[in-house]
């Protein structure tokens, strides 16, 4: 049986932790940051786990 290919867009956006959780970046931290409070941009820096409802779909895209 052939190997599954990783969806390249998903491969760039998500990473799998050592325990198998899927992590993603938060939105709203690419541009137009001047008017956003520093507190908000600091909090947006951290990665967060993918929602449970989306995890199965993302795993399929990542070929896992």
UniProtKB/Swiss-Prot annotation:
The keyword DNA repair does not apply. GO terms for molecular function: structural constituent of ribosome. Pfam families: Ribosomal_L35p (PF01632). GO terms for biological process: translation. It comes from the Bacteria. GO terms for cellular component: cytosolic large ribosomal subunit. Keywords: Ribonucleoprotein, Ribosomal protein. Belongs to the bacterial ribosomal protein bL35 family. PANTHER family: 54S RIBOSOMAL PROTEIN BL35M (PTHR33343), LARGE RIBOSOMAL SUBUNIT PROTEIN BL35M (PTHR33343:SF1). This is Large ribosomal subunit protein bL35. It comes from Acidothermus cellulolyticus (strain ATCC 43068 / DSM 8971 / 11B). The lineage of its organism: Bacteria, Bacillati, Actinomycetota, Actinomycetes, Acidothermales. The gene is rpmI.
